Swiss-Prot record:
<dbReference type="GO" id="GO:1990904">
    <property type="term" value="C:ribonucleoprotein complex"/>
</dbReference>
<dbReference type="InterPro" id="IPR003256">
    <property type="entry name" value="Ribosomal_uL24"/>
</dbReference>
<comment type="subunit">
    <text>Part of the 50S ribosomal subunit.</text>
</comment>
<protein>
    <recommendedName>
        <fullName>Large ribosomal subunit protein uL24</fullName>
    </recommendedName>
</protein>
<comment type="function">
    <text>One of the proteins that surrounds the polypeptide exit tunnel on the outside of the subunit.</text>
</comment>
<comment type="similarity">
    <text>Belongs to the universal ribosomal protein uL24 family.</text>
</comment>
<dbReference type="InterPro" id="IPR041988">
    <property type="entry name" value="Ribosomal_uL24_KOW"/>
</dbReference>
<keyword id="KW-0699">rRNA-binding</keyword>
<dbReference type="GO" id="GO:0019843">
    <property type="term" value="F:rRNA binding"/>
</dbReference>
<dbReference type="InterPro" id="IPR008991">
    <property type="entry name" value="Translation_prot_SH3-like_sf"/>
</dbReference>
<dbReference type="GO" id="GO:0003735">
    <property type="term" value="F:structural constituent of ribosome"/>
</dbReference>
<dbReference type="GO" id="GO:0005840">
    <property type="term" value="C:ribosome"/>
</dbReference>
<keyword id="KW-0689">Ribosomal protein</keyword>
<dbReference type="InterPro" id="IPR014722">
    <property type="entry name" value="Rib_uL2_dom2"/>
</dbReference>
<comment type="function">
    <text>One of two assembly initiator proteins, it binds directly to the 5'-end of the 23S rRNA, where it nucleates assembly of the 50S subunit.</text>
</comment>
<keyword id="KW-0694">RNA-binding</keyword>
<dbReference type="GO" id="GO:0006412">
    <property type="term" value="P:translation"/>
</dbReference>
Length: 82
C-alpha cells in the first residue's frame, strides 16, 4: 500500500524509471503526488499579493503506475550459478 513519505518508482509514462517520495495521496481518485515526478506548468494570474507567471509544480499520477521501493530489501546483485 502506497502511503505518504514512502519511496516509489514510476512504471509508465514520460517519467518512467524515475524515483521519488510520495508527497500527497488522493484516496477517492487513487492518485498520488510524487516529488519531482509529473512536473506541469501552470499559468498564474497576477493578484495583489502574488506576482503572476508560469509556475512548475508536481501533478497527481495514478497509483497503478507506481511501484513501491523497499529500501531494506535492496541488496547487491546476485549471480546465477550454472
Amino acid at each position: 500500500m502506497i502511503k505518504k513519505g514512502l519511496k516509489v518508482r514510476v512504471l509508465t509514462g514520460r517519467d518512467k524509471k524515475k524515483e521519488g517520495e510520495v508527497i500527497e495521496i488522493d484516496r477517492p481518485n487513487n492518485r498520488a503526488k510524487v516529488q519531482g515526478i509529473n512536473i506541469v506548468k501552470k499559468h498564474v494570474k497576477t493578484t495583489k499579493e502574488k506576482k503572476g507567471g508560469i509556475v512548475s509544480k508536481e501533478s497527481f499520477i495514478h497509483i497503478s503506475n507506481l511501484k513501491l521501493i523497499d529500501e531494506k530489501a535492496k541488496t547487491k546483485k546476485t549471480e546465477a550459478k550454472k
